[in-house]
Amino acid sequence: MSGTFSWTHLLIIALLFVVLFGAKRLPDAARGLGRSLRIFKSEVNQMQHETPQANAAPVQQPAQQLPPAQPAQAPAQPVNQAEQKSA
């Protein structure tokens, strides 16, 4: 076994498709696949044409910078273990 497909393998796969899906449904499936690929290609091309325009747009800075929030209370002081046992 060399791991490659020969023409007999491809013929068997084609026959399986005909048996599983039927001869009437195969052309419809191929048409649907072709339409899907066409739509996919057009979307990819559209995204490639939009990408340079999106990168060229200037980035606007926010109008107002808010100061950092102040903590509501001072952090708690650690309790000494010796003082905690005597209480």
Swiss-Prot record:
Keyword match Acyltransferase: no
Check the record and name the InterPro entries matching this protein: TatA/B/E, TatA/E
An annotated Gene Ontology molecular function: protein transmembrane transporter activity
> Where is the sequence biased in composition, kind Low complexity?
52-87
Which residue windows are transmembrane per the record? 3-23
Q: Does the keyword Protein transport apply?
A: yes
Q: Which family does it belong to?
A: Belongs to the TatA/E family.
Protein name according to UniProt: Sec-independent protein translocase protein TatA
Instruction: Record the organism.
Output: Nocardia farcinica (strain IFM 10152)
**From which lineage does this chain's organism come?**
Bacteria, Bacillati, Actinomycetota, Actinomycetes, Mycobacteriales
Q: Which gene encodes it?
A: tatA
